[in-house]
Amino acid sequence: MEMRAGMLESRGNRVKWVYSSGGDEMELGKRYDQWAGLYDEDINEHFGYTLPEKVSEIVANWLPGKAVKLLDAGAGTGLVGQSLSALGFTDLVAIDLSEGMLEEARNKGVYRETLKMILGKPLFFEAEFFDGVVCVGTFTLGHAPAESLDEFIRITKPGGYIFFTIRPGVYENAGFKEKQAALEASKQWEQVLI
């Protein structure tokens, strides 16, 4: 489905259009490819999106030695990587399902590597590869499933951290609450901050 001309004129319509992909990964990726060039302007200027900066500050507080390897999962155009880089983090890897979004991320010049991968599927990293995983704005309706957390745990070193944002409604209704409880019960991870 192509973005119609009217969609290009309204930021709100672009967001609705992307979110209406019906959970189809291929369609979602195509829609993000088409939105990539306008994404930063839409999100920052129209919606006042500040989560990348806020989460990056939290990451810096929990991982104060900047010589750590971080995965930006669902990196999009690289807003989180840009914020982490501004705080001194240099070993950053980005993954996203949209090549168009990854191209925008590459243009920011803050990632060591950018790779096309789909959250919820096996990730092409060795076990215990990263000191931390950061996932901002990706756990939302029709995007990455709760099962993504299993791979985050697998690729994070023991004692590492997984930082993610999620809206309460998605947490309650899309399997994340149950997944988190199961991971805590099986001692695979421990929640340290809300």
Stretch-by-stretch model annotation:
Residues 122-133:
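A short acidic, Gly/Pro-enriched loop at the edge of an enzyme's catalytic core
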Residues 48-68:
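Conserved alpha-helix/loop element of class I SAM-dependent methyltransferases that forms part
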Residues 135-138:
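A short beta-strand submotif of the Rossmann-like class I SAM-dependent methyltransferase core
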Residues 146-158:
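A short glycine-rich, Lys/Arg-flanked "PGG" loop and its adjoining helix->strand segment in the class I
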Residues 174-194:
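Conserved Class I S-adenosyl-L-methionine
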Residues 1-26:
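N-terminal auxiliary segments of SAM/dcSAM-dependent transferases
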Residues 159-167:
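Conserved beta-strand signature within the Rossmann-like core of class I S-adenosyl-L-methionine
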